[in-house]
Amino acid sequence: MEKFIKLIKDKLGDKVTLVFDKKYLSDYVGAIQGKADVLVKAETTDDVAAALKLAYENDINIVIRGAGTNLVASTVPEGGLVLDVSNLKEIGQIDEFNQSIEVGCGVKLCDLQNFVESKGWFYPPDPAEKEATIGGNISTNAGGMRAVKYGVTRDYVRELEFVTPQGNVLKFGADTIKDSSGLNLKHLVIGSEGTLGVVTKARLKLIPKPAYTQSALIAFTSLRKALDALPTLFAMSLKPTAIEFVERKVIAIGENYLSKEFPCPEAEAYLIVTFDGSEQDVLDAFNIA
């Protein structure tokens, strides 16, 4: 390990340190503590490529780390190298003609969404953890509540810059709606959770920002009636943006914790339904629902 640390320090200089910050040894839950021998804080794709190449040649374990919001210990190292890619956080200009934007893997989802929405655009994937990085979203094919209408991360990745374990930098995909030339390796990488290499950049599809969004709480006297309502909602001309099912047992826990009563206390189940679109379309949808 001493030989490897010297090699990687010679290559990457002060971007290489020992692991003093305990956040690199755990995940967001903090229940499991790992161990690591060295930390690389990459700032460019070349840094990532150099670190991966040296680790591969010297048979060193690697854990890739973005925002560290993972809840299942997959970012907990078991010795070797922690490669922090959170500094690859450049947000490019919006390509309005192709309706896309290029971002670094370290860009936080919330920062991307705030940026594009301030320009009148919309990036739909909406997993629960908004502080997660785009690289993490791609590696896990994150979805979220809006997947009901808009799909998951995979549906919004046009192009990927990807570094293999051997340190080769590859590009997959194209900034087009349809690309049927060759093997679709982009989709092999998406959802692979870092097992095939490291995503360093991505060009993401955007859509125009919906003009109006509204949610409603619908109460039901039984769980069965709530579930039976779902086909009707999905058959509507304006598809729901998100649907969340909540049963009375869960509500009771929240009421006890917050010391507040939920609306319609006699209900056994609830659907929280969100629609987006033009204001009139959304209002019409709620009238039908």
Give the positions of each predicted feature:
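Noncatalytic alpha-helical scaffold of FAD-dependent oxidoreductases
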Residues: M1-A289
